[in-house]
Amino acid sequence: MVDKLTHLKQLEAESIHIIREVAAEFDNPVMLYSIGKDSAVMLHLARKAFFPGKLPFPVMHVDTRWKFQEMYRFRDKMVEEMGLDLITHINPDGVAQGINPFTHGSAKHTDIMKTEGLKQALDKHGFDAAFGGARRDEEKSRAKERVYSFRDSKHRWDPKNQRPELWNVYNGNVNKGESIRVFPLSNWTELDIWQYIYLEGIPIVPLYFAAERDVIEKNGTLIMIDDERILEHLTDEEKSRIVKKKVRFRTLGCYPLTGAVESEATSLTDIIQEMLLTRTSERQGRVIDHDGAGSMEEKKRQGYF
């Protein structure tokens, strides 16, 4: 008698198959590591795929210099514990221009420090495939993207120019200068991610758990006071509105552009229970998703992950 795979084991097997396919099919793949929960699961799956050997490709963090301090500490800890080959890239042009989310706004900051930074890094190292942790349930433009997402020589995505992926068969043929973005977690949901983290004991950034944190409400979004830089861009009136609230984060990005949610979830079981009851998107706290109608699709057309 053959035991049937559970839902999570089926997802795990599918993701591991995709990761191995890319490693075998492409000359120079890389795994993007954004330090969030999806990256943690994807990295865990990749390590399973090649255990007991090491990952046959590096991991890369495109750093905007505005991530939460806890994220940087967690990244360095994981790199040391897992012996990862980490590449960190910061857009030097953005640094020279002093780009930041306060002075230049979320759209320009994201374009220069994330999108252009990513394209620079991919070109610099000659990567022909890049793994990412995006899922179809996150956002409408990601819902119509394939597992193998083809990009032209300028890293642009054309949603009308995609290949069929019938019966889990993936066509990785690309012309010189072209590349693909690969999404092994495409068919996972946010709840799947949390249940898998719980079952596998995957370490995650503590920001996902509720705790008393200093926040300020700006345009209906709770922004955490993560370091002194944000205070330079607040008026005295805004500073007077900084309060302590028990909050956590469902998604993590640049801290001035990532909203917290009020929560009592201090453990993985609490978070899973919360996910079973919630009716809002995890990306509701991402300021960059509200830059305009179809903003995420437009960003992806320009090369954003």
Curated annotation (Swiss-Prot):
Disulfide bonds: none
ATP-binding among keywords: yes
Major enzyme class: transferase
A GO term for molecular function: sulfate adenylyltransferase (ATP) activity
Domain of life: Bacteria
Reaction(s) the record says it catalyses: sulfate + ATP + H(+) = adenosine 5'-phosphosulfate + diphosphate
Pathways per UniProt: Sulfur metabolism; hydrogen sulfide biosynthesis; sulfite from sulfate: step 1/3
InterPro entries listed in its UniProt record: PAPS_reduct_dom, Rossmann-like_a/b/a_fold, SO4_adenylTrfase_ssu, Sulfate_adenylyltrnsfr_sub2
CDD domains: Sulfate_adenylyltransferase_2 (cd23946)
UniProt keywords, alphabetically: ATP-binding, Nucleotide-binding, Nucleotidyltransferase, Transferase
One Pfam entry name: PAPS_reduct
UniProt EC number: 2.7.7.4
Function per UniProt: With CysN forms the ATP sulfurylase (ATPS) that catalyzes the adenylation of sulfate producing adenosine 5'-phosphosulfate (APS) and diphosphate, the first enzymatic step in sulfur assimilation pathway. APS synthesis involves the formation of a high-energy phosphoric-sulfuric acid anhydride bond driven by GTP hydrolysis by CysN coupled to ATP hydrolysis by CysD.
Subunit structure: Heterodimer composed of CysD, the smaller subunit, and CysN.
HAMAP family recorded: Sulf_adenylyltr_sub2
Protein name: Sulfate adenylyltransferase subunit 2
Organism: Pseudomonas savastanoi pv. phaseolicola (strain 1448A / Race 6) (Pseudomonas syringae pv. phaseolicola (strain 1448A / Race 6))
Organism classification: Bacteria, Pseudomonadati, Pseudomonadota, Gammaproteobacteria, Pseudomonadales
